[in-house]
Amino acid sequence: MASVTFDHVTKKFGDVIAVNDLSIHIEDKEFLVLVGPSGCGKSTALRCLAGLEEVTEGRILIGDQVVNDVAPKDRDIAMVFQSYALYPHMSVFDNMAFGLKLRKTPKDEIKRRVDEAAKILNIEHLLDRKPRQLSGGQRQRVAVGRAIVRHPKVFLFDEPLSNLDAKLRVETRASLSRLHQQLGTTFIYVTHDQVEAMTMASRIAVIKDGILQQIDTPQHLYDYPDNIFVAGFIGSPSMNFFNAHLRADDGKLYVDLGNFRVQVSEGHPEAYRAYVNKPVIFGIRPEDIHDPDFAPPGIEAQPVEGMVDVTELMGNEVFVYVQSGEHTFIARVDPRTRFKMGSKGLFSFNMKNMHLFDKDTEKAIR
């Protein structure tokens, strides 16, 4: 097993910078997820680690070894792609064993490793089948099994769940989390899906335009985003953002949004004071906007009037799309709510969980 380090890694394709001065240290046995929109450079970073792309600048280390000039086959890593890439004419057993056979591993050792991986993945009963006889989820497990039998130092996953339906993605996420615990190996996982990142990662690295925006635990990333991009990318529905001004009145601070204002929580950061009478971006998550009749006790609620545009019943909650003057926002409320399309109502903003961002830099004010 091994740690992985990106040390000021840059990757260029001509004049295009795909990865820009990336520095991340991934601990041994960690489950790190690289997340970001399509084209942000996350898969390129993974391919550089795998040796499928040459690094333009910087170093990549696996353990204490710099691997920039090490051939992919000698890096002791295993990669699982979005495409399962199974040999259609081979059985599941032979697909899983193929890499070991190329390395001239003894037959009894091959059987032991394949049987061990099949047991972990619960595909023992599929070893004699051909890929065409398998479901999408089963094929994905075979592809993972082919990686497991190699006993690599590091597992790389490049959007492995993209071809699965929604129900199967949920099941496979849980399976991969269990697999990580069982194997105790370093996992590095690339996805554009923030739900996958939040549910599986021990840490998440958010990337935009080839630049690392923030790296932290899922909960801390969610609660304390460093900038507007991270705040909007992590969470579903995403955070509501409003153009606003910070005002001071009788010793208290208010977020002034034109047609309404809300009082800032008493325990606000001292840094807010420097932004009085300046334009800011006010952010609040949908789950921090409540129907007052069903708001949790003890929250620091500020009432805001709005017109209900659309409601979406999700079963255990309702997404309410609201128009308030020139502002629109989404509230994530109790399913017992009486809000209906076209109705007016009051919404409680839990200001204890508000966020403020610098309008020019888009960085969080703390």
Feature locations, PLM:
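ABC ATPase nucleotide-binding domain
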Residues: 5, 25, 61, 346-348
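Pre-Walker A (P-loop) beta-loop-beta motif of ABC nucleotide-binding domains
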Residues: 22-33
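The feature captures the beta-strand-to-loop junction immediately N-terminal to the Walker
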Residues: 35-37
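Helix-to-loop junction immediately C-terminal to a conserved catalytic motif
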Residues: 50
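ATP-binding/catalytic-site motifs of ATP-hydrolyzing domains
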Residues: 59-61, 65, 211
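ABC ATPase nucleotide-binding domains
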Residues: 70-229, 233
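Glycine/charge-rich catalytic "coupling/switch" loops of P-loop NTPases
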Residues: 252-308, 338-366
